[in-house]
Each structure stands twice: as structure tokens, then as C-alpha cells.
Amino acid sequence: MVIFPEKRSSKSTADLSLISDDTWAVLSENDTLGFVVRAGEIYVALSGSDLHHAVEISQKHRFDEAVASVRRH
């Protein structure tokens, strides 16, 4: 899955988009920064704009920490 920035409104203030029951896209104004996937009690932070090719960058116990990892990477 690829989330195309040109399909999003530039006026959107959303930082996260739920794309499945356990997967969120982390968004900037113009780009998809990465994803957070819930795996049991762990949140896996992935970097990259394509979910199927994103690279794992961290695993966190808290959702907000996983999102912060994606934003920092």
C-alpha cells in the first residue's frame, strides 16, 4: 500500500491515519513518514512511505513513543 501525498489536502492537520485495525500511517503535511503497527503488546515503528517496503526502526511499549520514533527518523 502506498499513501499518495498529492491525494491529501494540504490544509489537513492530521498526523495519523488509521489504515487497518492495527496499523497507522504517520503523516507530515506532504509526505508519509512511516507506520506504526501493533503487534500484541508492542508497537512497531516503521520508516518509509510504502508499508510493504518500510524498515523497522524501533519497538515500543507505548503508542506515542512509537509515533515519535517515526517522526524523529
Description of each model-found segment:
Residues M1-L27, S49, I57:
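Negatively charged, low-complexity tracts enriched in Asp/Glu with abundant Ser/Thr
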Residues D21, E29-D31, G40-E41:
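Short strand-connecting beta-turns/loops that link adjacent beta-strands
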Residues V26, T32-L33, A45, V70:
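Residue-level detection of beta-strand scaffold positions
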Residues G34-V55:
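Short aromatic-glycine-(Arg/Gly/Cys) micro-motifs in beta-strand/loop hairpins
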Residues S58-H73:
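Charged low-complexity stretches with an acidic bias
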